[in-house]
Amino acid sequence: MPSLTILAISGSLRARSTNTELLLALSALASEDTSIDLYDGLDRLPHFNPDLEPTEPASVMDLKRRLGEADGLIISSPEYARGVPGSLKNALDWLVSGSEFVDKPVALLSASSRSTYAFEALRTTLTTMSGRFVAEASITVPLLGRNLDAPAIAADPELSSALREALDVFCRAIGQRGAAGDE
């Protein structure tokens, strides 16, 4: 049984998204004591409306439950018009008032070296939400234009090494959080 569970969210709704493929490769590369729970419900979340919070839709409750059960969160996202995709920002808006996110270790991945604005916007949003951003585990994996699927990413020595190292750093950061909380 895995000792760590990491919720992974792709910021893209596109079929065969390079960011989703990156997360699938990360899952394939994870050690047997780490489980990657790939969330695929961004398209089922209603538009954020604070009036709906007292009677949260089932899709929102599912996201919050899965985040609450996870030891950490990894987001891999494209950049649209120098910003975060609306569907991803919508999901974060649903999480902002809950306790599930507080002090949750968070890492960011990007499949494009041209996503610096979205990366910074996400980092700002996540730290504003009281997430614990793990910069050392947040990386850009240059996949744009390479048309690689998850098995090809996982099989590539350079890419798989970078992903494994980022995941190892992230898991150690989660472990340090747990050890500090046990004291």
Regions found by a protein language model. Name each.
Residues 35-46, 69:
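N-terminal first-folded block
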Residues 41-58, 148-151:
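N-terminal beta-loop-helix "entrance" segment that forms/cooperates
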Residues 2-33:
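N-terminal beta1-alpha1 ligand-phosphate binding loop
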